[in-house]
A protein has these predicted regions:
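Canonical Radical SAM [4Fe-4S] cluster-binding loop centered on the CxxxCxxC motif
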Residues: 58, 64-96
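Radical SAM enzyme [4Fe-4S]-AdoMet core and its adjacent flexible, acidic
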Residues: 188-200, 207, 211-311, 334
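C-terminal accessory regions of radical SAM enzymes
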Residues: 19, 280-331, 361, 366-379
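Flexible mid-to-C-terminal extensions adjoining Fe-S/redox cofactors in radical SAM and related proteins
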Residues: 14, 331-422
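Detector for the c-type heme attachment site
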Residues: 79-84, 215, 369-373, 383
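Radical SAM/AdoMet-radical enzyme domain recognition
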Residues: 98, 102-118, 127-250
Length: 422
C-alpha cells in the first residue's frame, strides 16, 4: 500500500518550491534537487506536532441560529427548501430557545477566543425582533462572563430596515449578502414569490451599509450554477454596485449543480479573475476577490486541517426547535444531530461525527496532496465529489501557491498590514 504524500512539489513564476502538507509549510528548493524525508526532516517533524491525525476534543466556539423557516424569495437552487429543509423545520425560533442556545455556547466556549453567534434562515430578517433581542441578550451575557463575542448573518437583504442597519453597524456584524451579480444575472434565479426579480430590493436594503458600514464587514456571496460561470463579469458588476468583498460558491448538489464538463470552465474562470487581481496586488493595489484572499491568508497562516470547516467541532447550528446539528445545511438530518438534549452537545456523539469524517479516513482524499487544504470539502457535498471536481480544486490550489510565492517575494507587507503574520 502506497503511503500518502507528505509534500507536494510545485513551480511558481519565481522558482521551485515544496509544500509540506502538515502546517502548509512552503520551502524554496533548488531546481532539480532531489527530495526525501531527510532533506525535509525539520519541516516534517514540525508537522507531526500539529496533531492532524486526531479529531479535536472541542466545544462549539460559534453557533448559528436558524431564526425562521420562512423566506420571501424562491431561489431555484436553494439547498434549504426556502428554510423548511424538506419539512424537517417549520416555524420560527422563540426567544427562549435562542437564549438557551446562547447560554450553552457561553457555558462551554473558550474564554481566550472570540465566540460567534450567526443568524440564518429562511430569511432571518423576516423575524427581525428576535435578532435584535438576541444581540442584546448575548452581548449582556458575554459581558457578564468576560467573553468576547461577535455576530454574523447571511441574508438576501431585501428586508433590511434602518434599525437593522444600525444594529449591524454597531455590533461588528459579518454581513453576507446573497447576490449573484448584476440585475440580469441575479434576477434569473433569485426571484420573489411572485416570480419577479429581486435585485432592486437587494440593493435598496444593502446600499446604506455599503455607503456607511460602520463596524460591519459586508461581503457579497454569488452562487454559481451549471453553464453560468462568468466570474469576472459578475465580480465587476458587483464592484460597480459598491461591494468591496465578493466571493463565489458553486452549486454541487441539486438544481444547477456543476457537471464534470463545468469544472474545467470554473477553474479557468477562477484563475483568470485571480490573475487579474494578482496583477493589481503586485502593482500596489488591493483586491476584493474573497476566495482568492482567503486562500492567500490560509497559506500565510500555515493553515492545515483534516476538516473543511468547524462543523461538528468548533461550530454547531441550532434549529428552530432548539435541537443542535453539526451544520446549518443538515437541519433535521439525524446523521448530523449532536445530541438529544435541546440545550447541550453530546460530546461522545460529537466525537463520533468528527472521527468518521476525518480526511485521512476518506477515499480518495487520504491519498491526495491537497487533503489538508481542501480537507475533503463540505461534508454535505461529499456525495457529489468527482475526479473532475477534485482536479479543479487541485488546479486552483496550485495557482494559489504560485500566486502566494509571487506576492510574498514582491510585496510581503501586504500580509503584515492586512492579514497577520505567519
Amino acid at each position: 500500500m502506497t503511503a500518502p504524500p507528505q509534500w507536494h512539489r510545485f513551480g511558481s513564476r519565481i522558482g521551485d518550491h515544496v509544500l509540506v502538507l502538515a502546517g502548509s509549510q512552503i520551502v524554496d528548493v533548488p531546481e532539480g534537487a532531489e527530495l526525501d524525508t531527510g532533506s525535509l526532516g525539520e519541516f516534517l517533524a514540525h508537522g507531526e506536532t500539529l496533531g492532524l491525525d486526531n479529531a479535536p476534543d472541542v466545544r462549539p466556539q460559534g453557533i448559528s441560529l436558524n431564526v425562521t423557516s420562512a423566506c420571501n424569495l424562491g431561489c431555484s437552487y436553494c439547498y434549504a427548501d426556502r428554510g423548511r429543509f424538506a419539512g424537517r423545520q417549520q416555524g420560527s425560533m422563540s426567544r427562549g430557545t435562542a437564549a438557551a442556545a446562547i447560554d450553552a455556547l457561553l457555558r462551554h466556549c473558550d474564554r481566550k477566543a472570540r465566540a460567534t453567534v450567526g443568524f440564518l434562515g429562511g430569511e432571518p430578517f423576516l423575524h427581525p425582533a428576535l435578532i435584535h433581542e438576541v444581540v442584546a441578550y448575548a452581548g449582556a451575557r458575554a459581558a457578564d462572563v468576560g467573553q468576547a463575542i461577535g455576530f454574523s448573518v447571511t441574508t438576501n437583504a431585501t428586508r433590511l430596515r434602518e434599525a437593522d442597519h444600525d444594529l449591524i453597524r454597531a455590533n461588528r456584524f459579518a454581513l453576507t449578502v446573497s447576490v449573484d451579480g448584476g440585475p440580469a444575472t441575479h434576477d434569473l434565479l433569485r426571484r420573489n414569490l411572485l416570480g419577479q426579480g429581486s435585485f432592486a430590493d437587494v440593493m435598496a436594503g444593502v446600499a446604506p451599509l455599503l455607503a456607511t458600514p460602520g463596524q460591519a464587514m459586508v461581503t457579497a456571496r454569488a452562487t454559481l450554477v451549471s453553464g453560468q460561470l462568468n466570474l469576472a463579469q459578475r465580480y465587476d458588476a458587483l464592484r460597480a454596485h459598491g461591494f468591496t468583498r465578493i466571493g463565489f460558491s458553486p452549486v454541487r448538489l441539486g438544481f444547477g449543480a456543476l457537471t464534470d464538463d463545468d469544472w474545467p470552465v470554473w477553474t479557468r474562470a477562477s484563475i483568470e479573475l485571480a490573475e487579474r487581481e494578482l496583477a493589481e496586488l503586485l502593482a500596489g493595489s488591493d483586491t476584493g476577490y474573497d476566495n482568492f484572499t482567503t486562500a492567500l491568508r490560509m497559506l500565510h497562516a500555515g493553515a492545515s486541517s483534516p476538516f473543511p470547516c468547524g462543523a461538528g467541532g468548533g461550530y454547531a447550528s441550532v434549529a428552530t426547535d432548539g435541537r443542535w446539528y453539526a451544520c446549518h445545511r443538515a437541519i433535521g438530518n439525524a446523521d448530523y444531530a449532536l445530541g438529544d438534549d435541546l440545550a447541550e452537545v453530546d460530546p461522545q456523539r460529537q466525537q463520533r461525527f468528527l472521527v468518521a469524517r476525518h480526511v485521512d479516513r476518506l477515499e480518495p482524499c487520504n491519498s491526495c496532496w491537497a487533503r489538508y487544504l481542501c480537507s475533503g470539502g463540505c461534508h454535505q457535498e461529499a456525495p457529489a465529489r468527482t475526479d473532475a471536481s477534485c482536479q479543479a480544486i487541485r488546479d486552483w490550489l496550485d495557482f494559489c501557491l504560485d500566486a502566494y510565492c509571487a506576492l510574498t517575494a514582491a510585496r510581503p507587507e501586504w500580509f503584515g498590514d492586512h492579514h497577520g503574520n505567519r
